Protein backbone atom coordinates (compact mmCIF):
# COMPACT_ATOMS: atom_id res chain seq x y z
CA UNK A 1 0.00 0.00 0.00
CA UNK A 2 2.84 2.43 0.80
CA UNK A 3 4.34 1.82 -2.63
CA UNK A 4 1.01 2.52 -4.32
CA UNK A 5 0.56 5.77 -2.41
CA UNK A 6 4.08 6.87 -3.28
CA UNK A 7 3.49 5.90 -6.93
CA UNK A 8 0.51 8.28 -6.83
CA UNK A 9 2.74 10.96 -5.24
CA UNK A 10 0.81 10.90 -1.95
CA UNK A 11 4.07 11.11 -0.05
CA UNK A 12 2.72 12.04 3.39
CA UNK A 13 0.37 9.05 3.65
CA UNK A 14 3.04 6.75 2.25
CA UNK A 15 5.56 8.01 4.82
CA UNK A 16 3.11 7.20 7.61
CA UNK A 17 2.95 3.58 6.48
CA UNK A 18 6.72 3.34 6.05
CA UNK A 19 7.12 4.66 9.61
CA UNK A 20 4.81 1.91 10.85
CA UNK A 21 6.90 -0.66 8.96
CA UNK A 22 10.21 0.57 10.38
CA UNK A 23 8.75 0.70 13.91
CA UNK A 24 7.78 -2.97 13.64
CA UNK A 25 10.73 -4.18 11.55
CA UNK A 26 13.72 -2.12 12.64
CA UNK A 27 16.14 -3.93 10.32
CA UNK A 28 14.04 -3.53 7.16
CA UNK A 29 16.19 -1.44 4.77
CA UNK A 30 13.37 -1.07 2.23
CA UNK A 31 11.24 0.70 4.84
CA UNK A 32 13.92 3.31 5.53
CA UNK A 33 14.50 3.72 1.80
CA UNK A 34 10.78 4.33 1.37
CA UNK A 35 11.03 7.15 3.92
CA UNK A 36 13.87 8.69 1.91
CA UNK A 37 11.81 8.55 -1.28
CA UNK A 38 8.88 10.22 0.49
CA UNK A 39 11.00 12.92 2.13
CA UNK A 40 12.42 14.01 -1.23
CA UNK A 41 9.19 13.35 -3.11
CA UNK A 42 10.72 10.87 -5.53
CA UNK A 43 8.68 9.70 -8.49
CA UNK A 44 10.26 7.36 -11.02
CA UNK A 45 9.52 8.50 -14.56
CA UNK A 46 10.74 7.51 -18.02
CA UNK A 47 13.48 9.69 -19.51
CA UNK A 48 13.97 10.27 -23.25
CA UNK A 49 15.55 6.83 -23.68
CA UNK A 50 12.77 5.08 -21.74
CA UNK A 51 14.84 4.48 -18.60
CA UNK A 52 13.18 4.99 -15.21
CA UNK A 53 14.88 7.90 -13.43
CA UNK A 54 14.09 9.60 -10.09
CA UNK A 55 12.23 12.91 -10.34
CA UNK A 56 12.25 15.03 -7.19
CA UNK A 57 9.02 16.76 -6.08
CA UNK A 58 10.23 17.82 -2.62
CA UNK A 59 13.67 19.30 -2.36
CA UNK A 60 15.40 20.05 0.90
CA UNK A 61 18.56 21.75 2.09
CA UNK A 62 19.39 18.49 3.86
CA UNK A 63 21.71 16.13 2.00
CA UNK A 64 20.36 12.69 1.15
CA UNK A 65 23.72 11.15 1.99
CA UNK A 66 23.64 12.58 5.54
CA UNK A 67 20.04 11.62 6.28
CA UNK A 68 19.54 9.38 9.32
CA UNK A 69 17.20 7.10 7.40
CA UNK A 70 19.79 6.67 4.67
CA UNK A 71 22.34 5.66 7.29
CA UNK A 72 19.86 3.01 8.46
CA UNK A 73 19.43 1.84 4.87
CA UNK A 74 23.20 1.33 4.69
CA UNK A 75 23.36 -0.44 8.05
CA UNK A 76 20.60 -2.89 7.18
CA UNK A 77 21.53 -3.77 3.58
CA UNK A 78 23.74 -6.51 2.20
CA UNK A 79 26.68 -5.43 0.05
CA UNK A 80 24.84 -5.83 -3.26
CA UNK A 81 21.75 -3.90 -2.16
CA UNK A 82 23.94 -1.27 -0.48
CA UNK A 83 25.67 -0.50 -3.77
CA UNK A 84 22.33 -0.10 -5.57
CA UNK A 85 20.90 2.18 -2.86
CA UNK A 86 24.05 4.33 -2.87
CA UNK A 87 23.93 4.83 -6.64
CA UNK A 88 20.27 5.84 -6.46
CA UNK A 89 20.99 8.18 -3.55
CA UNK A 90 23.81 9.85 -5.50
CA UNK A 91 21.46 10.56 -8.41
CA UNK A 92 18.85 12.03 -6.05
CA UNK A 93 21.54 14.10 -4.31
CA UNK A 94 22.81 15.54 -7.61
CA UNK A 95 19.25 16.48 -8.55
CA UNK A 96 18.74 18.04 -5.13
CA UNK A 97 21.85 20.22 -5.52
CA UNK A 98 20.81 21.29 -9.01
CA UNK A 99 17.30 22.17 -7.86
CA UNK A 100 18.60 24.15 -4.87
CA UNK A 101 20.77 26.23 -7.22
CA UNK A 102 17.75 27.05 -9.37
CA UNK A 103 15.57 27.81 -6.33
CA UNK A 104 18.13 30.20 -4.86
CA UNK A 105 18.30 32.17 -8.10
CA UNK A 106 14.54 32.90 -8.00
CA UNK A 107 13.11 36.21 -6.82
CA UNK A 108 11.16 35.95 -3.54
CA UNK A 109 7.37 36.01 -3.43
CA UNK A 110 4.99 37.67 -0.99
CA UNK A 111 2.00 35.40 -1.54
CA UNK A 112 1.50 31.82 -2.70
CA UNK A 113 -1.94 30.94 -4.09
CA UNK A 114 -2.62 27.22 -3.64
CA UNK A 115 -5.55 25.81 -5.62
CA UNK A 116 -6.63 22.93 -7.86
CA UNK A 117 -6.32 24.12 -11.45
CA UNK A 118 -7.98 21.16 -13.21
CA UNK A 119 -10.40 18.42 -12.22
CA UNK A 120 -10.00 14.69 -12.87
CA UNK A 121 -11.31 15.15 -16.42
CA UNK A 122 -8.73 17.82 -17.22
CA UNK A 123 -11.31 20.61 -17.15
CA UNK A 124 -10.67 23.94 -15.47
CA UNK A 125 -12.07 24.08 -11.94
CA UNK A 126 -14.33 26.74 -10.51
CA UNK A 127 -11.68 27.62 -7.95
CA UNK A 128 -9.12 28.31 -10.69
CA UNK A 129 -11.22 31.27 -11.84
CA UNK A 130 -11.23 32.64 -8.31
CA UNK A 131 -7.46 32.12 -8.13
CA UNK A 132 -6.94 34.04 -11.37
CA UNK A 133 -9.12 36.91 -10.15
CA UNK A 134 -7.23 37.13 -6.85
CA UNK A 135 -3.91 36.96 -8.67
CA UNK A 136 -4.82 39.94 -10.86
CA UNK A 137 -6.06 41.94 -7.87
CA UNK A 138 -3.02 41.20 -5.74
CA UNK A 139 -0.46 41.87 -8.47
CA UNK A 140 -2.25 45.16 -9.17
CA UNK A 141 -1.69 45.97 -5.50
CA UNK A 142 2.06 45.46 -6.15
CA UNK A 143 2.40 42.13 -4.39
CA UNK A 144 4.57 39.47 -5.97
CA UNK A 145 2.28 36.45 -6.22
CA UNK A 146 2.98 32.82 -7.09
CA UNK A 147 0.20 31.32 -9.20
CA UNK A 148 1.15 28.00 -10.78
CA UNK A 149 -0.59 28.70 -14.09
CA UNK A 150 1.51 31.85 -14.50
CA UNK A 151 4.78 30.95 -12.77
CA UNK A 152 5.10 27.43 -14.21
CA UNK A 153 3.75 28.12 -17.67
CA UNK A 154 5.67 26.18 -20.32
CA UNK A 155 7.52 24.03 -17.77
CA UNK A 156 7.28 20.25 -17.60
CA UNK A 157 5.92 18.88 -14.34
CA UNK A 158 9.26 17.20 -13.66
CA UNK A 159 10.99 20.62 -13.81
CA UNK A 160 8.61 22.54 -11.53
CA UNK A 161 9.87 21.64 -8.06
CA UNK A 162 12.69 24.24 -7.70
CA UNK A 163 10.25 27.06 -8.46
CA UNK A 164 7.58 25.68 -6.13
CA UNK A 165 10.15 25.16 -3.37
CA UNK A 166 11.49 28.69 -3.71
CA UNK A 167 8.00 30.20 -3.62
CA UNK A 168 6.89 28.11 -0.63
CA UNK A 169 9.93 29.19 1.35
CA UNK A 170 9.86 32.88 0.44
CA UNK A 171 6.12 33.68 0.56
CA UNK A 172 4.94 35.04 3.91
CA UNK A 173 1.32 34.20 3.11
CA UNK A 174 -0.34 31.20 1.49
CA UNK A 175 -3.93 31.53 0.35
CA UNK A 176 -5.36 27.99 0.26
CA UNK A 177 -8.42 28.22 -1.99
CA UNK A 178 -11.23 25.69 -2.12
CA UNK A 179 -14.83 25.22 -3.20
CA UNK A 180 -15.02 21.47 -2.50
CA UNK A 181 -13.46 18.58 -0.59
CA UNK A 182 -11.56 17.57 -3.74
CA UNK A 183 -9.98 21.00 -4.09
CA UNK A 184 -8.17 20.63 -0.78
CA UNK A 185 -7.43 16.91 -1.02
CA UNK A 186 -5.97 16.81 -4.51
CA UNK A 187 -2.54 15.20 -4.09
CA UNK A 188 -0.57 18.14 -5.48
CA UNK A 189 -2.58 20.80 -3.63
CA UNK A 190 -2.30 18.88 -0.36
CA UNK A 191 1.42 18.56 -0.99
CA UNK A 192 1.63 22.38 -1.21
CA UNK A 193 -0.32 23.34 1.89
CA UNK A 194 1.16 20.50 3.97
CA UNK A 195 4.67 21.64 3.15
CA UNK A 196 3.79 25.26 3.84
CA UNK A 197 2.37 24.37 7.25
CA UNK A 198 5.65 22.61 8.07
CA UNK A 199 7.58 25.74 7.04
CA UNK A 200 5.23 27.99 9.03
CA UNK A 201 5.70 25.80 12.10
CA UNK A 202 9.38 26.79 12.06
CA UNK A 203 8.82 30.40 10.96
CA UNK A 204 6.07 32.17 12.89
CA UNK A 205 6.16 35.12 10.45
CA UNK A 206 4.45 32.93 7.85
CA UNK A 207 0.69 32.52 7.70
CA UNK A 208 -1.64 30.13 5.87
CA UNK A 209 -5.11 31.55 5.25
CA UNK A 210 -7.79 29.06 4.11
CA UNK A 211 -10.19 30.81 1.71
CA UNK A 212 -13.28 28.86 0.74
CA UNK A 213 -16.96 28.82 -0.13
CA UNK A 214 -19.57 26.05 -0.32
CA UNK A 215 -17.35 23.78 1.80
CA UNK A 216 -18.85 22.41 5.00
CA UNK A 217 -16.89 21.91 8.20
CA UNK A 218 -16.46 18.17 7.58
CA UNK A 219 -14.70 18.76 4.25
CA UNK A 220 -12.14 21.25 5.53
CA UNK A 221 -8.75 19.66 6.29
CA UNK A 222 -8.34 19.08 10.02
CA UNK A 223 -4.90 20.66 9.73
CA UNK A 224 -6.63 24.03 9.19
CA UNK A 225 -8.23 23.95 12.66
CA UNK A 226 -7.46 27.14 14.57
CA UNK A 227 -6.45 29.13 11.48
CA UNK A 228 -8.18 32.38 10.62
CA UNK A 229 -10.25 31.86 7.47
CA UNK A 230 -11.73 34.05 4.74
CA UNK A 231 -15.07 33.31 3.11
CA UNK A 232 -15.08 33.56 -0.69
CA UNK A 233 -17.95 34.77 -2.80
CA UNK A 234 -19.20 37.85 -0.97
CA UNK A 235 -18.67 41.57 -1.56
CA UNK A 236 -16.10 41.87 1.20
CA UNK A 237 -13.97 38.89 0.15
CA UNK A 238 -11.10 40.78 -1.42
CA UNK A 239 -11.01 43.49 1.27
CA UNK A 240 -10.94 40.84 3.98
CA UNK A 241 -8.11 38.96 2.28
CA UNK A 242 -6.16 42.19 1.76
CA UNK A 243 -6.57 43.07 5.44
CA UNK A 244 -5.25 39.66 6.50
CA UNK A 245 -2.30 39.93 4.12
CA UNK A 246 -1.46 43.45 5.29
CA UNK A 247 -1.13 42.14 8.85
CA UNK A 248 1.58 39.73 7.72
CA UNK A 249 3.33 41.37 4.76
CA UNK A 250 4.55 44.84 5.61
CA UNK A 251 4.20 47.19 2.65
CA UNK A 252 7.81 48.36 2.80
CA UNK A 253 9.00 44.77 2.43
CA UNK A 254 6.77 43.86 -0.51
CA UNK A 255 8.70 42.05 -3.25
CA UNK A 256 7.50 44.29 -6.04
CA UNK A 257 7.91 42.98 -9.59
CA UNK A 258 10.83 44.43 -11.48
CA UNK A 259 9.77 47.03 -14.07
CA UNK A 260 9.43 45.73 -17.63
Describe each model-derived feature in a short phrase.
Residues 1-20:
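Alpha-helical segment of the N-proximal tetratricopeptide repeat
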Residues 15, 22-23, 39, 74:
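A conserved position within tetratricopeptide repeats
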Residues 38-104:
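Alpha-helical linker/edge segments of TPR/alpha-solenoid repeat scaffolds
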Residues 90-177, 197-207, 236-260:
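Conserved N-terminal substructure of TIR/SEFIR domains
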Residues 188-215:
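Membrane-associated lipid acylation/remodeling enzymes share a hydrophobic transmembrane-juxtamembrane segment
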Amino acid sequence: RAGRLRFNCDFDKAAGIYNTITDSYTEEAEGYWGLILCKYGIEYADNASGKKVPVCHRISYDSVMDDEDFELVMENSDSESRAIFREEAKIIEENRKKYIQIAESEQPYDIYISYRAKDDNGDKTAVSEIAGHLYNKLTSARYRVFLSEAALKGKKQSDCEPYIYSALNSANVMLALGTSYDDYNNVWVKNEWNRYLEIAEKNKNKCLIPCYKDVDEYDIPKEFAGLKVCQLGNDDTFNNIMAEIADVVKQESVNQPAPE
